[in-house]
């Protein structure tokens, strides 16, 4: 499963509910992108969420 290395966001699971309160499983996927960033001074390709990219918490290589 892909997981953001900055914020830790990943796919979460839950129930989809109808008006009659019937339930079926569903999943919410985080908006993840595979980007190259500097990790320990070396370029590395990692999964990063769009929220982390927009906030400026990291710089692309």
UniProtKB/Swiss-Prot annotation:
Disulfide bonds: none
Alphabetized Pfam families for the sequence: Ribosomal_L28 (PF00830)
One cellular component (GO) term of this entry: ribonucleoprotein complex
Gene Ontology molecular-function annotations: structural constituent of ribosome
Sequence similarity: Belongs to the bacterial ribosomal protein bL28 family.
PANTHER family on file: 50S RIBOSOMAL PROTEIN L28, LARGE RIBOSOMAL SUBUNIT PROTEIN BL28A
Stated name of the protein: Large ribosomal subunit protein bL28
Organism for this UniProt entry: Lacticaseibacillus paracasei (strain ATCC 334 / BCRC 17002 / CCUG 31169 / CIP 107868 / KCTC 3260 / NRRL B-441) (Lactobacillus paracasei)
């Amino acid at each position: 499963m892909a997981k953001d290395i900055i914020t830790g966001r990943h796919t979460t699971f839950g129930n989809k509910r109808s008006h009659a309160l019937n339930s079926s499983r569903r999943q919410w996927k985080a908006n993840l992108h595979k980007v190259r960033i500097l990790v320990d001074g070396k370029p590395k390709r990692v999964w990063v969420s769009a929220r982390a990219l927009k906030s400026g918490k990291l710089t692309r290589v």
